[in-house]
């Protein structure tokens, strides 16, 4: 809604921010065309461009040379951060991260089961089916690819929560989250019993979300991460060293 008392650029910027918070505009996806945004928001092209300039200045919208504008990733922990270093050198950091994942992903699954749209479920299903196909062609898929598919499945559920603070929180920890998934894949996927357990738990999460069973989905997601934590801890108790190499996600995207 237009406000005569405020600069038009601020009004436009706030309208676009609301689309981001509501999940209409998603992190990393190209923005709709200027024409479509103008039609949706009811502003002129010149006003829209002024608003986008404000958002670029705030770091909310980014435009790479020769590419479309998109919603920026907010507050991401970079692969050079102290947390990434601690992840690869200090055993407790992995377990602390898994505790955080259990809380955040449990809530993501609960909200996704409650608020997820059919379009969200299509994305989740696509990610789940790709993950299943990779498991069936185990010898042809690298561990990093397995981890990417696993991470994408959990991220799709998070995005279906439509809680943008939760989405931004998880995305700000993308490299850390991916490395916890990679640690799980690297240390557990070659153990048949643990791999079957992970597959069953992924199926429970998927089915509970799509069947709109929020509390079942929350419990399934939490149990999954906590089981991974226990299995990794058991490996260390057996006297084996965990593989916990820090691998920035963006360096491994195909």
UniProtKB/Swiss-Prot annotation:
Translocase found in the keyword field: no
A molecular-function term among this protein's GO annotations: DNA binding
KO phenotype (gene knockout): Abolishes both glycolate oxidase and malate synthase G activities. Is unable to grow on glycolate as the sole source of carbon, in contrast to wild type.
Function per UniProt: Transcriptional activator of the glcDEFGB operon which is associated with glycolate utilization, and encodes malate synthase G and the genes needed for glycolate oxidase activity. Also negatively regulates the transcription of its own gene. Glycolate acts as an effector, but GlcC can also use acetate as an alternative effector.
Matching Pfam families: FCD (PF07729), GntR (PF00392)
Cysteine disulfide links: none
One example of a Gene Ontology biological process annotation: regulation of DNA-templated transcription
DNA-binding region of this protein: 34-53
GN (gene name): glcC
SUPFAM superfamilies: GntR ligand-binding domain-like (SSF48008), Winged helix' DNA-binding domain (SSF46785)
All residue ranges annotated as the HTH gntR-type domain in the record: 6-74
Keywords: Activator, DNA-binding, Repressor, Transcription, Transcription regulation
Keyword Protein transport (UniProt): no
Listed name of the protein: Glc operon transcriptional activator
Top-level taxon in the UniProt lineage: Bacteria
Induction: Is constitutively expressed. Is repressed by the presence of glycolate. GlcC exerts an autogenous repression on its own gene.
